[in-house]
């Protein structure tokens, strides 16, 4: 999304001035697999949050490799290093951005919290998010919402979601891919495992997709204007 707007630096300045706690977002040119693009970095208290690499496996479901899970970040109990939905809502309310943006961010967080509450069999008020994960996810969600508001698309068409496969390690132990919360959020949405082993769609990503999706399906006939 960032590559679709005319002035990236202006947007990043706006995002970093929104008051995201402990977070600084930056973007730099990057080359991966020979393709040039933009790498967006989220630094929490000076340390960059990184995603695990995924591996291409024909259809090798026999692989037992376990990947780290970065965006679930939830527990069904309290702790001083965790934030509940009430805490998250208060953080969002303090952001220096449009009220419509804040409302969308809160709604996306509610999707995640609702899915986690169903997975853990607890009330949504008992769901808590890890402190560092909360800062990282809040930056991801807020940035995406601000970009959607900047672009003002008439509709958002979502292709079938590739979830990945295998196993992922989180605070609760080793879980299947898609993680239980991701699977809950994607109920009723066209999905496939794909051929890349690892977690390709997190609860955060699934919540953003389902919240903004106007329709699901393969790419319709269209003319590309920006990539």
Protein language model regions, located:
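Conserved phosphate/anionic-ligand binding catalytic regions in large, soluble enzymes, centered on
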Residues: 1-2, 129-152
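Short beta-strand-to-turn element immediately C-terminal to the catalytic PLP-Schiff-base lysine
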Residues: 2-3, 211
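Glycine-rich nucleotide/cofactor/substrate-binding loop typically near the N-terminus or early
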Residues: 4-119, 179, 187-206, 219-222
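Residues at or immediately flanking beta-strands
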Residues: 24, 126-128, 155-157
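Divalent metal-coordination and catalytic microenvironments
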Residues: 40, 136, 209
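Self-splicing inteins and homing endonuclease
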Residues: 41-43, 133, 161
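Alpha-helical transmembrane cores and adjacent cytosolic helix/loop segments
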Residues: 111-131, 135
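Mobile "lid/hinge" segments at catalytic clefts and subdomain interfaces of large enzymes
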Residues: 153-227
């Amino acid at each position: 999304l960032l590559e679709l707007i005319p002035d990236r630096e202006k947007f990043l300045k706006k995002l970093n001035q929104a008051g995201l706690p402990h977070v600084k977002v930056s973007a730099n040119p990057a080359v991966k697999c020979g393709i040039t693009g933009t790498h967006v970095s989220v630094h929490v208290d000076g340390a960059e949050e990184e995603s695990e690499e995924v591996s291409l496996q024909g259809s090798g479901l026999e692989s037992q490799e376990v990947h780290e899970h970065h965006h679930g970040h939830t527990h069904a109990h309290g702790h001083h290093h965790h934030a509940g939905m009430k805490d998250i809502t208060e953080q969002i309310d303090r952001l220096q951005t449009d009220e419509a943006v804040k409302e969308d961010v809160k709604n996306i967080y509610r999707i995640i919290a609702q899915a986690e509450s169903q997975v853990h069999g607890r009330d949504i008020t008992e769901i808590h998010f890890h402190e560092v994960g909360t800062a990282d996810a809040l930056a991801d969600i807020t940035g995406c919402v601000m970009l959607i508001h900047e672009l003002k698309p008439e509709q958002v068409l979502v292709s079938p979601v590739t979830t990945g496969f295998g196993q992922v390690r989180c605070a609760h132990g080793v879980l299947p891919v898609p993680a239980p919360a991701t699977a809950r959020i994607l109920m009723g949405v066209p999905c496939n495992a794909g051929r890349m082993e690892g977690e390709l769609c997190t609860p955060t990503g699934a919540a953003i997709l389902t919240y903004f999706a106007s329709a699901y399906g393969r790419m319709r006939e269209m003319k590309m204007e920006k990539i």
